[in-house]
């Protein structure tokens, strides 16, 4: 009897393998993975969560690629989309999960977190005295702990670059409206100031409304503030750049191993074709913000002021699954008009060093001194009209360097802000 059961089990395994080899081809990596999944499902001694097995397998594959290819569950996907559309009740931050830690990309202007002094680059390590860092907590669980009804309090522990002790903040949750143009006004007669916090579904319309109102008041020149702008929708960025460039000027192009070169060019019908333009950036300006900055710099349409931007220039295609979950897969790189790749270097599968890049820049003094930035001659490029030297190698290098203001938040200010 025992021998008979062994033969039956072996036959069942062989049947699974034969079926998949017929459908997928003998020796195919996909066949190997599906044989393993089917074997676990049908032969494993205990019950298993098949959905979790598949999700973990997808995450494992993506971890071996670039730092920005990612998978999100249906609930996580919905939560991420809310940061660009609609409104919600919470603490008012946009964040990524970086090596099991919540890294704040930016705070919502006038939102609960900004009001108490939380900043881009902070890492939230605990919520209401419960650790959320280093415990492999899902994004969904973290979001659930941070969000809550308007008016309720939440206590968070924050690790900030350059500060040894964990900072404690008490935040009163509030309704978070999503307006991506944070501020606009005449900074002096004839000079407009517009700050864009992120590039969402309504950013272009918000920007145009602000620009036209300021032009009616006499604005001819513009300061465009993209500091701490973590990016967003490509089309919003392209539409805004179109307002500054002449007809057929190249804005950005993409190219990948399996994708042909795709160019985005200006139509020449913009509302800001003349007048001086200054773009403000810092180390947290990324993705769509870098596309805008790189186009204006390379086309000699304006001057870039600040510090080297983040360096996120990967084109990601969202691949939606039937259950509402999503995989964002990198398919190409973004290049500025002069040919500079916006993406900073990375080693596939080595996210740990990639995630330390900003910390390393800080330690090397790059945030405080332009002399701390060393670039090879091979990274030199030329702007398209005036043939000025600009640099590649990841991120956008400003034309004029402005050091980080180390006096922005004193120890006393942090203590007061943490206590609301």
Where are these regions (language model features)?
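Bacterial Sec-dependent N-terminal signal peptides
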Residues: 1-26
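Cleft-lining beta-strand/loop regions that shape enzyme active-site pockets
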Residues: 18-29, 33, 37-50, 73, ...
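PDZ/PDZ-like peptide-tail recognition elements
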Residues: 56, 68-106
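Extended catalytic-interface subdomain
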Residues: 317, 329-347
